[in-house]
């Protein structure tokens, strides 16, 4: 059964590129354009991995990760951001993070590592 990945980014081009690459690699991918939509999807399905932009409208990655850690602890998280300085400040410095712009194939390698592949 393919691994379930949720890609969350309000920048549609970035989100679509990540989702396309992951689908090409055989992952089942859902997309969300903000944190609130992401949490609604997480409440309906179980995901192996969440790839999430840090700064988004309606609900930031900080709140999404906090809720995930309390209710879906088995879901791994990779953050993407243009503001890496915010991670330590908000207590998320322990999570893997890619600073925009980043190489999609570097992200793919990290996805495989995080998912134990």
Where does each model-flagged region fall?
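Acidic, metal-coordinating helix/loop segments flanking the phosphotransfer/catalytic sites
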Residues: 6, 31-49
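Charged docking surfaces used in two-component/phosphorelay signaling
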Residues: 16-24
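Acidic catalytic/metal-coordinating carboxylates
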Residues: 34-37, 60-66
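Conserved phosphotransfer cores of two-component systems
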Residues: 43-45, 67-75, 86, 90
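Active-site residues of response regulator receiver
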Residues: 53
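Receiver (REC) domain active-site loop signature in two-component systems and cognate sites
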Residues: 56
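Alpha4 helix (beta4-alpha4-beta5 surface) of REC/receiver domains from two-component response regulators
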Residues: 63, 83-100, 105, 109
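Hydrophobic/aromatic residues positioned on beta-strands within the core alpha/beta folds
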Residues: 78-81
């Amino acid at each position: 059964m393919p691994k379930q990945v949720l890609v969350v980014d309000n920048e549609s081009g970035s989100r679509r590129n990540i989702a396309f690459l992951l689908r090409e690699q055989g992952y089942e991918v859902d997309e969300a354009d903000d944190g609130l939509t992401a949490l609604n999807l997480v409440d309906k399905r179980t995901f192996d991995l969440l790839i999430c932009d840090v700064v988004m409208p309606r609900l930031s990655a900080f709140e999404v990760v906090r809720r995930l850690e309390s209710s879906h602890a088995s879901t791994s998280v990779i953050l993407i951001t243009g503001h890496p300085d915010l991670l330590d400040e908000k207590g998320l410095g322990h999570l893997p993070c890619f600073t925009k712009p980043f190489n999609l194939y570097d992200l793919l390698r990290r996805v495989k590592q995080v998912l134990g592949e």
